[in-house]
């Protein structure tokens, strides 16, 4: 077993190599995306199993902060004592595993519950292209911390992501949501947000709510956390009050975290729609081109001219537009109705006249809005993220507000990468953008973990 001090650097440097290697492969195969499916299937298994083993078999050490407390509680449960947790499913799992698993085996089970649902959720939605989403989750800013330190939170949010993936199967979704709550009660917030945005679907509303919460938090200071502490839904659980009024971490308004939180939504609005728009523009050019319009007109004229309709429509060598348009469903007579209108349109010879385009609103000009309106699940995911993140902004001044931030940040990798990976709406992967996003996201994680955090410890 490796020394505990090496695990965090190995994670950061090892995942850096994995991300760079995958990004180079995706970038090189931009025109051969189909050849990457076999790689994706193998990589999601190899990387997933490797991460479970790496996290699960780490030594019990203070380097992983709360891991020591988890180990002490588990050993107490093994001896018949009571757990210190108020989360029923987590307590039940402790008692079950305590009968036949050692402490190291218990942490392997926790690592499996933390990592496996992420892979299953991505596979449920993206199929053979699940690996980029899974890799984005493994390299997210908070992944390592909630795998080795905030263990219950990580397990609960991973199960909740799997519940989101079964949004179209309530029989599966609701038990998974209940399981997530059983691992950690804080998941009640993103669960409620996911159910609420099912009925309030406009992303513009939730984006405005996010901005409003940011303004209120910056102006009113700690009013938000006092409100949350006062209306604590778990009266018997003092964790929320400790997170807000504790003094273990530096509090204050974090503009950097605020900017970090809005990156996925901004990226969606600016980039997401380009994937769908290119396909739509190609279909529009093919479907409304002059050649196809001319062929449709010829077919219509031939159909009218066949059988008994031929004599009814043609009188003395002159075409009767009224009869022709009536046969085509036109209500009136004369060249202004039915097929005649198309024939005598400014395009002429059966070409459709150019129609005036509706002037789009300000939000419609953003390409990502189109994807949000054509993919209900992605819109629901974005709206859930905005609502949960907005509630964190209200308590951003708290000393341990990162505990609240994770209730939205765990969705961030999926929100960020979803528009570029094949799913129900997007059918062609944008491998170049996938490579760029994977590198950009992990660059932030790497700099924070390898450069910024060590400097804070020195200074």
Question: Which residues fall in each region the model found?
Answer:
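Alpha-helical transmembrane segments and terminal signal-anchor/GPI-anchor hydrophobic tails
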Residues: 63, 67-72, 87, 194-305, ...
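Short hydrophobic/aromatic helix or loop-helix immediately within or flanking a transmembrane segment
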Residues: 66-102
